[in-house]
């Protein structure tokens, strides 16, 4: 399994647990880092930190493009797959959009319901198609474009 694929899964594990426990993802990340048998990949840390920093904005984007669905109505795993992928689409420039979508759909296929993969694909395709109009603030420490 490629390194970034593993990192996405580890990041999803942290985000999922934080969501279920209504906890701060950064605290869950610190806990995972402290008790992990294998180190938490740097890319997983970057993803969790990015989602945590932009969560309100990401959730607004999900609600905008998940027509007919509220965040609370979505399965927890789907909601966090979308958070992870939208962060990558809007703030991680070195990963091609097609890879982000494919990885998110694969996570949904592997970890969620039969309906989840098409749902995740549809929401992310809509975000990607409207990327120019979706406002994404720059990562911390970087100037706006």
UniProtKB/Swiss-Prot annotation:
Source domain of life: Bacteria
Sorted alphabetically, the Gene Ontology cellular component annotations on this record are:
cytosol
Write out the entry's keywords from A to Z: RNA-binding, Transcription, Transcription antitermination, Transcription regulation
Q: Which GO terms describe its molecular function?
A: RNA binding
Q: Which residues form a coiled coil?
A: none
The record's annotation in Gene3D superfamilies points to:
NusB-like
Give the UniProt record's GO annotations in the biological process aspect: DNA-templated transcription termination; transcription antitermination
Q: Looking at the Swiss-Prot or TrEMBL record, what is one Pfam family this protein matches?
A: NusB
Tell me the protein family, please: Belongs to the NusB family.
Q: What does this protein do?
A: Involved in transcription antitermination. Required for transcription of ribosomal RNA (rRNA) genes. Binds specifically to the boxA antiterminator sequence of the ribosomal RNA (rrn) operons.
Family matches, as HAMAP family? NusB
Q: Which NCBIfam families match?
A: nusB
Question: What's the name of the protein?
Answer: Transcription antitermination protein NusB
- Tell me the organism: Acidothermus cellulolyticus (strain ATCC 43068 / DSM 8971 / 11B)
* Classification lineage: Bacteria, Bacillati, Actinomycetota, Actinomycetes, Acidothermales
- Gene behind the chain: nusB
